[in-house]
Amino acid sequence: MADVGATGAEIRATRIEKAKTLQAQGMSPYAYRWERTHTAALLQDKYAHLAAGEAVGDRVSVAGRIMARRIFGKLAFFTLQDDSGTIQLYLDKQTISQTMGEAAFADLKHLTDVGDILGAVGTLKRTEKGELSVVVESYTMLTKSLLPLPDKWHGLTDVEKRYRQRYVDLIVNPQVRDTFRKRALITAAIRRYLNEQGFIEIETPVLQVEAGGAEARPFITYHNTLEMQLYLRIATELHLKRLIVGGFEKVYELGRIFRNEGISTKHNPEFTSIEVYQAYADYNDMMTLTEAIITTGAMEVLGTLKITYQGETIDLTPPWRRVTMHDAVLAATGIDFRQLGDLTAAKIAAQKVGVKDLDTCDTIGRVLNEVFEQIVEPTLIQPTFVLDYPVEISPLAKPHRSQPGLVERFELFIVGREHANSFSELTDPLDQRQRLEEQARRKAAGDLAAHSVDEDFLTALEHGMPPTGGLGIGIDRLVMLLTDSPSIRDVIAFPLLRPESAGGQV
């Protein structure tokens, strides 16, 4: 039965029968291993000099997935794909029959399908049409696929299926594979750069007694043996700071973070970030470090600092623009929050420029931040450091050395998204206690993103933490930027989705 016109169930049943036939003939449809001498890319490079019609007697062994089959009587052409690329298999009945017996070519025609994984041994030639090919002397079924590949996968309107069956997406879409290769190169380059600068990566707990280091709702779990509630970490900050207290002067961790919050093209509940802490530095030093980390990633995978994201040209060449939050809001809206006397006046001014959802804003600083996020943030296309945030939304940052009510904090925005967050870290344990106790009061009042006081962290601070600059960069968003990917789901191999039985996509 041909795949064309057949249902998925019919195709599967037919392929199971083919697997049984192979088994009956003494050929396992699921091999244990294969001795491969060359990848497709290595062959394409090594034999690029062959002219059309030229052949060499070098014997090679290849393996990969059949992506296309064309059979013309006593001659067949298969496209074989491995991790490096594709190579054509040139299969003629006479050559294969001499090596494997008369039935081998018929088995090739009738028992193989697109999607199967095949091993082949042969010599090299370039066909008259210019296609480098392995002239197959013998072949072995390595894995019989039971389900068909889609004829056209990339470009389907049902993008959810691409995320849900990522393995199929990876098989048929080279661009997706390239995205994840670039992701690996970016993270490796960042680690290499930091290591060269004298930083050390230390792993901190994922399961934590207290959630802290960010204003975010945590995932909650339970340890049966200890009979205690635990949280999946929402940040690595507080443990990395403990390491600074302990005497490490340059530490970082690149790892997974978990936040029980919304899902969008910019947010996934499980994501990757890197946090970096440097003793005797402040947020000015962290701006320089941020530029270095991001440009390192860009040069690693793109070789240039002038990039394109979703049609927008972005120039990552340092130094990047720096503007205070107050000045950014003033320029965009005409509102000078430094001149507003009370919360009511701040809310009225914000509402006049179209800002919504101000009910939970209980200070002028929170209103300022809401205006910034709704009005200014989407306009920050080129790399921009926004500096000096209200103290009430930055409980772990050091007070600004010259601006009361503000802290030494910046966030980096590119293409209207936050890409990094940094502080001159708060090292005063008494001030830190007051801020964490305020958070605890907010939690008691029902704020799910606020947290209890982490007494052990405060104990660490009371032992003395040197002046420290801290930095966090979202790896997923950075990979989105450097691979021109519109959604965070495009750069996470297996993004969280609601099970199909529960009603499909979130």
From Swiss-Prot:
Necessary cofactors: Mg(2+)
Q: Which domain of life is it from?
A: Bacteria
- Look up keyword Transmembrane and say if it applies: no
The record's Pfam families line, in alphabetical order, gives: tRNA-synt_2, tRNA_anti-codon
Principal location class = cytoplasm
Q: Which residues bind Mg(2+) 2?
A: E418
EC number in record: 6.1.1.6
Q: Does the keyword DNA repair apply?
A: no
The Gene Ontology biological process annotation of the record reads: lysyl-tRNA aminoacylation
Uppermost EC category: ligase
Give me the residues that bind Mg(2+) 1, please.
E411, E418
InterPro entries listed in its UniProt record: Aa-tRNA-synt_II (IPR004364), aa-tRNA-synth_II (IPR006195), aa-tRNA-synth_II/BPL/LPL (IPR045864), Lys-tRNA-ligase_II (IPR002313), Lys-tRNA-ligase_II_bac/euk (IPR034762), Lys-tRNA-ligase_II_N (IPR044136), Lys-tRNA-synth_II_C (IPR018149), NA-bd_OB-fold (IPR012340)
Q: Which residues form the signal peptide?
A: none
GO MF annotation, one = tRNA binding
Q: Which UniProt keywords apply?
A: Aminoacyl-tRNA synthetase, ATP-binding, Cytoplasm, Ligase, Magnesium, Metal-binding, Nucleotide-binding, Protein biosynthesis
**Family stated for the protein in its record:** Belongs to the class-II aminoacyl-tRNA synthetase family.
Q: How does it assemble?
A: Homodimer.
PANTHER family documented for this protein: LYSINE--TRNA LIGASE, CHLOROPLASTIC_MITOCHONDRIAL, LYSYL-TRNA SYNTHETASE
| Identification of the protein by name | Lysine--tRNA ligase
Q: Which gene encodes it?
A: lysS
